[in-house]
């Protein structure tokens, strides 16, 4: 195993231990752990990453709407990826889009709101 692979393995191990070892892990650390773990187990960790990103945006960045928006956009991307990997995950994507939409509305981003509304409507009619 080369040093890069060893470091990556060590980081993954630390992330797993952090998530398993603490019931009160700060959401920032939770997000960091899920971002790592999703690389090796996307089916297991994409839904958790999407939820943790939303919580992180809400808890830590309510006063920074631009950062909160970026985190919610990342949550939508994780949910989209999950939907692509496994059928029946549209509720995850729907939830992420609704949360993203709320942040767009807060920032009065009308053009992006229209696109998100269209995607939500597609999901509501059996799309994706």
Please tell me what each predicted stretch does.
Residues 20-35, 64-79, 109-118:
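Helix-turn-helix repeat elements of alpha-solenoid scaffolds
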Residues 18, 37, 59, 63, ...:
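Surface-exposed polar/charged interaction patches
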Residues 31, 37, 49, 56, ...:
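Heptad-repeat amphipathic alpha-helical coiled-coil interaction surface used
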Residues 34-46, 78-91, 126-128:
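Flexible helix-coil transition and linker loops at the boundaries of alpha-helical arrays
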Residues 2-20, 43-62, 88-107:
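Amphipathic alpha-helical repeat scaffolds of TPR domains
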Residues 52-60, 67, 75, 119, ...:
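Charge-rich, low-complexity amphipathic helices
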Residues 101-128:
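A generic hydrophobic-segment detector
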Residues 1-40, 118-128:
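N-terminal alpha-helical interaction modules that lie
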